[in-house]
A protein has these predicted regions:
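Residue-level signal for mature regions of secreted extracellular proteins and peptides
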Residues: 13-16, 33-37
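Terminal C-lobe "cap" of eukaryotic-type protein kinase domains
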Residues: 1-18, 49
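Short hydrophobic/aromatic patches on the structural cores and recognition surfaces of FHA
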Residues: 6, 101-106, 110-115, 120-124
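Short cysteine-rich clusters marking metal-coordination/redox-active sites
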Residues: 20-23, 38-44
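Disulfide-bonded cysteine-rich modules in secreted/extracellular proteins
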Residues: 16-25, 53-56
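C-terminal boundary/linker segments immediately following FHA domains
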Residues: 116-119, 125-175
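Cys/His-rich microdomains that often coordinate metals
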Residues: 26-35, 48-50
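N-terminal beta-hairpin/loop module of FHA
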Residues: 51-109, 138-139, 161-162
Length: 175
């Protein structure tokens, strides 16, 4: 890409890397080690840690099928930690505020907690199979999703400048 596009390209690349808990090196989350044929670090073969994978799709309405994700954001999410999800997951990439926190996600044995950031501009709604009420529910302050299995999936919807449907998956270290 030309220099004008470097910030976005570098952010996209960085957003798809994880840090190895064994050697602290960074690598792409979907790397499959040729020796182990599993998601292991390419440098020391330590299994990939538990990760949160967010795939952001441009929403064009219910009559239009989803295209390929326009953004992917992947981070390690150890139990008990809180992960900051930046604005670029919910809207177009902008140099000035793409790193601004929109949502905070924490994972524990009892469930997933989704909280709006103090600086959030997005109106976020969440839908999950494990949530007692079916369909999308608006997150006013925070929302809890029950964790029935180690690998959890839920959806977030944001209607900013460019409406986004975000598929959220928590994947264990053995996946």
């Amino acid at each position: 890409p030309t220099i004008y596009h470097w910030p976005e390209a570098l952010a996209q690349a960085a957003d798809m890397t994880v840090t190895c808990p064994g050697c602290s090196m960074h690598y792409y989350y979907d790397f499959i080690h040729p020796e182990t044929e599993a998601h292991h670090c390419p440098y020391c073969t330590t299994p990939r840690p538990q990760v949160l994978i967010l795939e952001s799709y441009r929403w064009k309405g219910t009559d239009t099928p989803l295209e390929l994700p326009c953004w992917r954001y992947v981070r390690e999410i150890p139990p008990g930690s809180e992960l900051t999800v930046p604005r670029r997951v919910f809207d177009e990439f902008l140099m000035l505020d793409s790193d601004t926190a929109e949502v905070l996600i924490s994972s524990g044995d009892e469930g997933i907690l989704i909280k709006k950031s103090d600086h959030a501009k997005a109106d976020v709604s969440v839908a999950a199979d494990s949530h007692p009420q079916r369909g999308f529910q608006t997150v006013y302050s925070q929302m809890k999703i029950d964790r029935a299995t180690p690998d959890v999936q839920f959806w977030m919807f944001s209607n900013m400048n460019s409406p986004r449907l975000v598929k959220c998956m928590i994947s264990g270290s053995d996946k």
